[in-house]
Amino acid sequence: MKALLLITAAIFIFGGCQNAATKKTDSGVPNVATDIKEVSPADAQIAVSKAYSQFIDVRTPEEYSSGHAARAVNIPLDTLTAKLDTLEKNEPVYLICQTGNRSKKAAGLLKEAGFNNVLNVTGGTTAWQTANLPMETLPPHGAPPAK
């Protein structure tokens, strides 16, 4: 009888853990799937410079214009869903933000939308800068580009 109670309790405990991993957050963004790959800034930089890949910075336009990883294109997290049709599902997609949190959310969105090869840059732009990897900046909105 005690064994039956222990087995029943274990089913409830482990069943609750499994559901928590698949629930969506309060914002409707899915929790990150376990199959999203993390990649170091150095490895991401090598990959995006050598082969066709999509490198997306999901920060706000203001954050992006103040300095971003070289070759990264700005698609803010809050507009990503609307722009999924501009991305190639079967090509690698590297995602970066400031510290890695928003890019993890973006990775979850892409995986849910059927993207096959989604990679999150560990530590985001902060780690990219710490590793002294190439950065680019944009002039302030409305300012002419530097010559």
What spans do the regions from the language model cover?
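Structural scaffold elements adjacent to functional motifs in cytosolic proteins
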Residues: 55-57
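Rhodanese-like catalytic fold shared by cysteine-dependent sulfurtransferases
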Residues: 2-6, 12-50, 62-91, 103-147
